[in-house]
UniProtKB/Swiss-Prot annotation:
It is found in: Cytoplasm. The lineage of its organism: Bacteria, Pseudomonadati, Pseudomonadota, Betaproteobacteria, Burkholderiales. This is ATP-dependent protease subunit HslV. Na(+) binds at G162, C165, T168. Signal peptide: none annotated. Keywords: Allosteric enzyme, Cytoplasm, Hydrolase, Metal-binding, Protease, Sodium, Threonine protease. Protease subunit of a proteasome-like degradation complex believed to be a general protein degrading machinery. The keyword Metal-binding applies. The active site is at T7.
Length: 178
């Protein structure tokens, strides 16, 4: 069976503002199945942003579990992320899920992987998915050389990733916390 491929999710934190954005393309093999998927969402009373890359069903499964962890830990992002990563690493069924998450609240941004990693990105910039390297490089260059807002940096870096990665389109959804 063919795998669902790619997307690009990028987050930029600058001062007390954070933006998280993603494209909308879902690809199965060499076919674009959907161009307007929503891979960036607000959860936990709109206080937490989450973006996902990887298998769509896998990502939704992890998103549900992450929301439950946030509820259990009263919105403590780091604690919820670590608990999800531990479950993901140790649970036989969860270990098969192929997805990654970026989560952000007013003070913290984290990348959560299926290897049990919970990473606090250096410089407040991170990206995942097939176009992640392009988006992250663009975001770093823009953050270091301009005064653009996090939202503007995310928008421009997604545009650049969409120009370079065949699994990333220009249908962007960007959420912010200020």
């Amino acid at each position: 069976m063919e795998q669902f491929h790619g997307t690009t999710i990028v987050s930029v934190r600058r001062g007390d503002k954070v933006a998280l954005g993603g494209d909308g393309q879902v690809t199965l093999g060499n076919i674009v199945m959907k161009g307007g998927a929503r891979k960036v969402r607000r959860i936990y009373n709109n206080q937490v942003l989450v973006g996902f890359a990887g298998g769509t069903a896998d990502a939704f499964s992890l998103l549900d579990r992450f929301e439950a962890k946030l509820e259990k830990h009263q919105g403590n992002l780091t604690r919820a992320a670590v608990e999800l990563a531990k479950d993901w690493r140790t649970d036989r069924m969860l270990r098969r899920l192929e997805a990654m998450l970026i989560t952000a609240d007013a003070t913290t941004t984290l990348v959560i992987t299926g290897n049990g990693d919970v990473l606090d990105p250096e410089g407040g910039i991170c990206a995942i998915g097939s176009g992640g390297a392009y988006a992250q490089a663009a975001a770093r260059a823009l953050a270091e050389n301009t005064e653009l807002s996090p939202r503007e940096i995310v928008e421009k870096s997604l545009e650049i990733a969409g120009d370079m990665c065949i699994y990333t389109n220009h249908n962007r959804i960007i959420e912010t916390i200020e």
